[in-house]
């Protein structure tokens, strides 16, 4: 019986060793551009430095997926002011290419919704309360050509998260990454990874 079990395992390992895979190129080839620009993601209905932190995580994932030079252009307001326009339309795309010398640029936003405080009773007898805050966080980004203003790629990702505490200012939640919030770091890193999936090569079984 034992010998039969060993033989079965050996056959399974042998079969696994025969499986072949092929590398599938990324759905979006960013290396077609000499240089790309990145506008700081705009934070919607939230205060703090969440926009800057989310932009940096997105930048890290893009450059990890494909080795392409990325120029950080600044906030949406600063970029639009620099080119004398008020929105990211075709004229803005052409102007950004001329002013910053990039062939395409990323622009998008990050939003936090469904912010709900939670209070958990640690133990029935201890009467110790722990306050947490649950929320949904979404990130949407598009890649725009500066040659003709066309949208070359767009995607969005949503994730639920929970942090220890969230401040409120003027009725809007305040997220501060400077507070070394590990939970928020993990949420931002995961959503940035999901959002940049099209830039990564994948492995497919033959």
Which residues does each PLM region occupy?
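Short secondary-structure boundary motifs at beta->alpha junctions and helix caps
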Residues: 130-138, 144-193
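Short, solvent-exposed mixed-charge patches
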Residues: 204-206
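Short coil/turn motifs at beta-sheet boundaries
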Residues: 29-31, 101, 130-134
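Structural motif
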Residues: 10-13, 28, 97
């Amino acid at each position: 019986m034992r010998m039969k079990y060993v033989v079965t395992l050996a056959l399974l390992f042998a079969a696994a060793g025969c499986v072949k895979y092929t590398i599938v190129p990324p759905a979006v080839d960013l290396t077609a551009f000499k240089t790309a620009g990145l506008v700081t993601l705009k934070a919607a209905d939230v205060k703090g430095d969440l926009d800057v932190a989310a932009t940096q995580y997105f930048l890290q994932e893009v450059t990890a997926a494909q080795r392409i030079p990325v120029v950080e252009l600044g906030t949406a307001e600063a970029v639009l002011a620099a080119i004398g326009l008020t929105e990211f339309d075709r004229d803005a795309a052409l102007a950004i290419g001329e002013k910053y010398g990039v062939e395409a640029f990323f622009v998008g936003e990050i939003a936090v919704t469904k912010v709900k405080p939670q209070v958990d009773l640690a133990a029935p007898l201890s009467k110790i309360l722990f306050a947490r805050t649950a929320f949904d966080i979404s990130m949407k980004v598009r890649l725009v050509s500066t040659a003709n203003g066309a949208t070359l790629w767009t995607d969005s990702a949503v994730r639920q998260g929970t942090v220890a505490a969230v401040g409120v200012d003027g009725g809007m939640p305040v997220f501060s990454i400077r507070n070394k919030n590990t939970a928020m770091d993990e949420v931002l890193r995961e959503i940035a990874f999901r959002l940049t999936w099209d830039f990564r090569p994948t492995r497919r079984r033959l």
